């Protein structure tokens, strides 16, 4: 298996191998801000991860210690595995957080969005506060999307038995984002500040606001 010389979990290695071996599928994920690279890239990042992490987040203590990068986005941010299970994001502007409960749900989310950027279109409290708002945002994004990878992603979804149901995708997203304890970095240098959540550059306030909105919707 490719990526066999990396420290990534086997299920993550299997997805990376499938994607990197299929040019169309790799391009499709690239369009969604999930840039998959070869084993040498992963291995090099593993060897230099401490410095890479500090370059992105500054000096600090992470709430999760077992962090392994498996992809980048277009800004240079990292998609990572936390504790060999959770999927996290480490941004370039001081933000980080958990985005999915596992690699299967993460891959399902990306494939179901079909070329729509998860990061730029859906990570905000208003969009995620209800199923209806999320589905409206999805429909608007699909209309504006210039890249059509529907056929490629449909094949990927069918192969893995993933869902296309947007209500289920919404559930995957909000349950992933609201996993606790939060993935955050507490600054250990006075010249830096604590990390923000992926929902906004204000510490964890936006994430807590989302949790409150979801609880209110259930009452």
Please place each PLM-identified region on the residue numbering:
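Compact, glycine/acidic-enriched structural inserts
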Residues: 88-129
């Amino acid at each position: 298996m490719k990526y066999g010389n990396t420290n990534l979990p086997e299920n993550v290695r299997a997805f990376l191998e499938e994607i990197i071996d299929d040019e169309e599928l790799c391009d499709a994920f690239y369009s969604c801000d999930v840039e998959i690279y070869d084993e040498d890239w992963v291995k090099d990042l593993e060897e230099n991860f401490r410095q890479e992490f500090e370059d992105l987040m500054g000096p600090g203590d992470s709430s999760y210690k077992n962090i392994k990068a498996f992809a980048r986005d277009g800004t240079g941010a990292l998609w990572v595995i936390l504790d060999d299970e959770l999927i996290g994001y480490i941004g370039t502007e001081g933000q980080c957080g958990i985005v999915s409960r596992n690699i299967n749900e993460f891959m399902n989310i990306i494939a179901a969005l079909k070329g729509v950027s998860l990061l730029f279109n859906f990570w905000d409290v208003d969009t995620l506060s209800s199923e209806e708002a999320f589905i409206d945002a999805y429909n608007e994004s699909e209309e504006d999307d210039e890249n059509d990878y529907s056929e490629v992603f449909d094949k990927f979804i069918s192969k893995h038995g993933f869902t296309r149901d947007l209500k289920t995708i919404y559930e995957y997203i909000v349950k992933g984002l609201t996993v606790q304890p939060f993935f955050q970095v507490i600054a250990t240098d006075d010249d830096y500040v604590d990390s923000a959540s992926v929902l906004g550059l204000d510490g964890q306030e936006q994430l807590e606001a989302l949790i409150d909105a979801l609880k209110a919707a259930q009452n």
